[in-house]
Amino acid sequence: ENVSIGAALEYAVKILGVKDIIVMGHAHCGGVAALCKSINNDKEGEAKDNPTDLIKSWVDIAKPALSKIDFDHNDANIEVNSERAVVLYSYNNLLTYPWLKDAVSRNSLEIHAWWLDFKSVMLWKKAQGSDSFIPMDF
């Protein structure tokens, strides 16, 4: 657990009175692509030296998010599904902070999970009560 993340969240919500937290992901995310590549290399038994060990350590935090993604099938949506899975993973991780979960249940805080498709210029949000994403209306 990274204490600085919790401290920043605690300061924002408890001291500054932030009412909304947005977990934002986006299409063609290099971090998620690197994580997917790392998972495929692990499956194939390829151990590669990584000149970006700090970046790898950072993206590896989200590795559990991709446990339900089937990388063995060449699915056209695998990139989008992986990116959105990481957003949901981060969203759910926020709710592991008891004081954040409590603030959400008291309706004094809202946590949003969004995913942006740069190409279509569409913003998607986590559907309430579901792990699916729906387009946002403006």
For each of these PLM feature ranges, what is it?
Residues 1-20, 31-138:
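Divalent-metal-activated hydrolytic enzyme cores
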